[in-house]
């Protein structure tokens, strides 16, 4: 198992589960009966076939002293991994989000393949929901999105579709667990590749330091102010979600000369500023966001494991003027992306580890030992499908990412695009981020404020 995947197993403890998830909302077809969820659950369980990825569970080699590797469960219990739930009355979105919050706070069983899917009925408007979670060591956000989309169809009339855990039509080669010799060879290869990457990453670090002396928009690691989000966390979670019109955001990006992601960051920055002012907790220095950058190419590349770099963005939360804040964010992201130009994937990962490694491994040491956090919040934008999708005739109406709070990073904002919408998923430590749902109102206020000013 690559170290970029194993780090999520090494850093996980009971209070800090390290799985990613997603909430999907479906509108059943008009001819669906009242038992549509029960029938779908039975059909999924009876399908039987499970792809290699969804049979993997982790183990330590060399009697527990060696590196992590994957085993395959030959007797997988689908009824354990796939579950059927119903919401309590009155069956509003509030009850659904409360259920997802509880489900996302529990660890996955490492003695079994590291995934679950919950089929949920009882919404008053007739829609049905699915909540799925998979360990970050198995899939990153982009890979999880690709696997989810792979199990859907653009044809509303297609029926008898296999569940998302079924083997793909074109089987992928199985990844053998290997033995001690394979582990040693893999480590040696990593050392050689890592040596080259160290040189590239060192040069990039020097360029970043030089740029920070010239441009106040530049963000250096471990120079972010402490905030109410940068504290040790507990295991309980709170989840909130909302959709925005993608064309509205694109129009604003065109007006301001930025990108959709710049607007997403500006919305988030304005919302965080308002939220912190509500709690009389806004630092004088600007908050800094970690922004994941996918290192994956086309669909032909591997769709498992982790291939993500991290750049830093100055959120300009010290600025009251929304346009000045947006301009600062735009410059900061431009400079951070320029830092990665010409670097190989390993060098990008190594450079990112300077920022993110201590966060992922937070449970292994006392977070409070860091005088300043590397960043204050993670804001991620995962591209999603552009056209409407269906599963056995049920239209996918919403897809909301459910990510990970880390020790010292009590809030995560993840966004995905789908069929003309931007879907925001906010996940936070229930104890450390009170009234998290207020951030949804602040996101709308922040967007409207920037529209009016621009």
Where are these regions (language model features)?
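Soluble acyl-CoA-dependent acyltransferase catalytic core bearing the H(X)4D motif
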Residues: 1-4, 23-409, 413-444, 448-454
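Generic start-of-chain signal for non-secretory N-termini
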Residues: 1-19
């Amino acid at each position: 198992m690559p170290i970029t995947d194993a780090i999520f197993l090494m850093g996980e403890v009971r209070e800090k589960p390290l799985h990613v998830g997603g909430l999907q909302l479906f509108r059943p077809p008009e001819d669906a009966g009242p038992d549509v969820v029960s029938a779908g659950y039975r059909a999924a369980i009876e399908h039987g076939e499970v792809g290699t990825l969804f049979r993997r569970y982790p183990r330590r080699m060399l009697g527990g002293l060696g590196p992590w590797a994957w085993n395959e469960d030959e007797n997988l219990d689908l009824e354990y991994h796939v579950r059927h739930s119903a919401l309590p009355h009155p069956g509003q979105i509030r009850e659904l989000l409360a259920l997802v919050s509880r489900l996302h706070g529990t660890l996955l069983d490492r003695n079994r393949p590291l995934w679950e899917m919950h089929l949920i009925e009882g919404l008053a408007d007739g829609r049905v929901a699915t909540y799925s979670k998979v360990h970050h060591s198995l899939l990153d956000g982009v890979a999880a999105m690709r696997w989810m989309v792979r199990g859907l169809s653009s044809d509303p009339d297609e029926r008898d579709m296999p569940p998302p855990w079924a083997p793909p039509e074109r089987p992928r080669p199985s990844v053998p667990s290997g033995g001690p010799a394979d582990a040693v060879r893999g480590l040696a290869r990593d050392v050689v590749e890592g040596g080259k990457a160290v040189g590239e990453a060192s040069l990039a670090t020097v360029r970043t330091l030089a740029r920070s002396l010239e441009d106040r928009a530049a963000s250096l690691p471990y120079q972010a102010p402490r905030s109410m989000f940068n504290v040790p966390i507990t295991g309980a979670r709170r989840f909130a979600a909302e959709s925005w019109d993608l064309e509205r955001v694109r129009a604003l990006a065109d007006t301001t000369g930025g990108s959709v992601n710049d607007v997403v960051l500006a919305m988030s920055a304005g919302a965080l500023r308002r939220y912190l002012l509500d709690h009389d907790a806004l630092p004088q220095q600007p908050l800094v966001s970690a922004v994941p950058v996918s290192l994956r190419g086309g669909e032909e590349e591997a769709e498992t494991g982790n291939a993500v770099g991290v750049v830093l963005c100055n959120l300009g939360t010290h600025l009251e003027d929304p346009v000045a804040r947006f301009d600062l964010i735009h410059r900061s992201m431009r400079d951070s992306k320029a830092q990665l130009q010409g670097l190989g994937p390993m060098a990008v990962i190594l450079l990112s580890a300077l920022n993110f490694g201590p966060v992922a491994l937070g449970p292994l040491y006392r977070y409070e030992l860091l005088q300043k956090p590397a960043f204050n919040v993670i804001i991620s934008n995962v591209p999603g499908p552009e056209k409407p999708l269906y599963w056995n005739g049920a239209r996918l109406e919403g897809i909301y990412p459910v990510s990970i709070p880390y020790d010292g990073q009590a809030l995560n904002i993840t966004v995905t695009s789908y069929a003309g919408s931007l879907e925001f998923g906010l996940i936070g430590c229930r104890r450390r981020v009170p009234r998290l749902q207020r951030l949804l109102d602040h996101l709308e206020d922040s967007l409207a404020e920037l529209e009016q000013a621009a």
